[in-house]
Amino acid sequence: MTENTHHDPAALDKLTEPFTVLPNDNPASDEKRQSLIDKPAFGQVFSDNMTHMTWTKGEGWSDRRVEPYAPLKMDPGASVLHYAQECFEGLKAYRHADGSTWLFRPDANAERFQNSAKRLYLPELPIDDFLGSVAALVKRDANWVPSRREYTLYMRPFMFASEPFLGVRAPQEVDYCVDRKSVV
């Protein structure tokens, strides 16, 4: 998947090990998925699954999972809706000549994500958790990565203050997710 872990299955497994993979009872059919890949529409089509984890001030990062793509439940008082405490990154998954899926320098994305979080008083996501969340989703939704050389699959890691709280302070509860957009 990355230049450092692609040829080392043990390293990749170690990164994805903390993530529980939940069943998806309604994935896109092969035919539907292929038709969506063949006609890219950036930001309008999403893959079958997403990664999700939570952070609380008392417990830190927990509940690492790959789950079916679905709307997020959010309290109307969530801090992100009132104070815009949110950050995101973007990276692309592409099909390598040998059929494997690779990402370009995801460690650099992880470092930028940490810096963005720090500036917004959000908790810094450990680099291994960032890489593990992306790797777990790549493994689960590998069939969404196009085989045509000119196409890639865009991945969007994002974090937001999900705690229902109106006031100015660092959040006590945060959600982090990675979803995959259509081919670009």
Regions flagged by a language model, labelled:
Residues 1-184:
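Conserved alpha/beta cores of soluble small-molecule-handling proteins
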